[in-house]
Amino acid sequence: LSTVLILGEVTHGSKISFSLGGITFQPSEFVKILFLFFLAGALWENVSFQRVVLTAIIAGAHVVILVVSKDLGSALIFFVGFVFVVFAATRNYLYLFAGIVGGGAASYLAYQLFDHVRIRVLAWQDPWKYIDNKGYQITQSLFAIGSGSWFGMGLLKGNPTAIPYVEADFIFSSICEELGVIFGMCLILICVSSFFEMIRIAVRIHDRFYQLVVYGIGIMYIFQIFLTIGGGTKFIPLTGVTLPFISYGGSSVMTTMIMFFIIQGIYIRLQKEGERRGGK
């Protein structure tokens, strides 16, 4: 992440990507997986206060680098993933409370220190006031959702090009415009059911390390969906993250696939362990 901050390319105002041989990739997407394995490895046996503090310092460094790179969505995903993995490892509500308070304080500090954070908050608070500049994205997104209504305008009958970066940040708005809000709600239900299945698998795992990994993947997955859809519907400020498996972006799709492969591999391992115990 530090290398990207120094040498990376600026994409849509954020320094988050590299280009090698004409192929652009976003390292922060792949670092998510390494980050989760680091958290699980650090906390699966030792959950002492000293270990949690050391883990928090390292996790905090990741978040700070992402904020400075203007990759606010990834910073939030890393932070929330850390807080909930720590809670899953310790079962201590004080850590959860401290994470929420710390996150709120950090958000306020980021608002005071970084112009790009203030711009996104202002655009979220009153996009109609800034419809010609910083509020243009969110207003066009809301127009698209409203135009689609319940049943949509029909496939290929919408106007997705009116929304900047529709293929990434605002793909949900385009789906609602062409296929309708009902279809969008069904899509949300599919994502939520996938999350619940991840948590169900995590609860059944006896190996603490694998359990924390699956918990972390589930939290990051559902929180990223919340950020994308919430930003596009003006429920929260825009964060610039993709909708897993749906938005355009090879790094995002590949990372999500790897995360699902990891869970599937752990689930197969769990089934085999159950068969061995049943045989005995």
Regions found by a protein language model. Give the residues of each.
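Juxtamembrane loop-helix boundary motifs flanking transmembrane segments in multi-pass membrane proteins
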Residues: 56, 133, 137, 163-171, ...
